[in-house]
Swiss-Prot record:
Source organism: Drosophila simulans
Classification of source organism: Eukaryota, Metazoa, Ecdysozoa, Arthropoda, Hexapoda
Classification via InterPro entries: eIF3i, WD40/YVTN_repeat-like_dom_sf, WD40_repeat_CS, WD40_repeat_dom_sf, WD40_rpt
Function: Component of the eukaryotic translation initiation factor 3 (eIF-3) complex, which is involved in protein synthesis of a specialized repertoire of mRNAs and, together with other initiation factors, stimulates binding of mRNA and methionyl-tRNAi to the 40S ribosome. The eIF-3 complex specifically targets and initiates translation of a subset of mRNAs involved in cell proliferation.
UniProt subunit comment: Component of the eukaryotic translation initiation factor 3 (eIF-3) complex. The eIF-3 complex interacts with pix.
Subcellular localization: Cytoplasm
Repeat (WD) residue spans along the chain: 8-47, 50-89, 145-184, 188-227, 285-326
Protein name listed in UniProt: Eukaryotic translation initiation factor 3 subunit I
Gene3D superfamilies listed in its UniProt record: YVTN repeat-like/Quinoprotein amine dehydrogenase (2.130.10.10)
GO BP terms, alphabetized: formation of cytoplasmic translation initiation complex
Main location: cytoplasm
The keyword Repeat is annotated on this UniProt entry: yes
Amino acid sequence: MRPLMLQGHERSITQIKYNREGDLLFSCSKDQKPNVWYSLNGERLGTYDGHQGAVWCLDVDWESRKLITGAGDMTAKIWDVEYGTVIASIPTKSSVRTSNFSFSGNQAAYSTDKAMGQSCELFLIDVRNADSSLSEQEPTLRIPMTESKITSMLWGPLDETIITGHDNGNIAIWDIRKGQKVVDSGTDHSAGINDMQLSKDGTMFVTASRDTTAKLFDSESLMCLKTYKTERPVNSAAISPIMDHVVLGGGQDAMEVTTTSTKAGKFDSRFFHLIYEEEFARLKGHFGPINSLAFHPDGKSYASGGEDGFVRVQTFDSTYFENIFE
């Protein structure tokens, strides 16, 4: 089936995310304006206008009422999903690199970059009664990162922990009640982690790293379960909610890209078997590295956002579901 090509960004995509039901697809890019799309037909429903810098991250809450974004203009913003208005704008001392709502939707976490003389910090805020006064309130928790900066973040089970992926390849679990690190993965990855995404049941998550691999980890012990190897940096990876499949996307850094790379298959979405670690399919499409991937919650399609500024929504053919490993 022909993919849907969503063209609404002027610069490269930084992150895409589906809401829980999968009817909405959110995208953000370096062009300052996050977008929301109707995932079934690719219609753009609206933009969230207010940031003054590249938007690095976004997340939508469980009920699709609030959206949180973090940007290079040194703010994290909470938006009303339906009306597109800013509920709260939280100033920070450096760029906001990651942002996530907790599963309950009561809290949100975001992290700032190690830049301009500022250290990387992880912040927790209460968003139950979020309004403009949130910008003056102190965060409920603040954890300074003494080592490497956070490049990716997930909430752990029951909103009790936060899993962070770092620029040096480390993964750590933080107890948010104590504000302390409880598990450290060591150096399973030899280079920075670009993305982390949970499985549907939350028991494991997949990482995408600059060391050219994606790995599957246990969410509680951080034990490395599987490794998916490629030849170039992996920017994003996602786990199918219905099949034992993992999709990887990446490519070289934008500086190293040449126009011939497209022919060489360097910008494909690559499908691996979750358990056997074998690559079984590739899908072409983007003219440049893939920066973000997301499976639709029903597992029947997936979306990819690339350096070329396009979001592509690809619906799987029936043969995909019949693909049984011998």
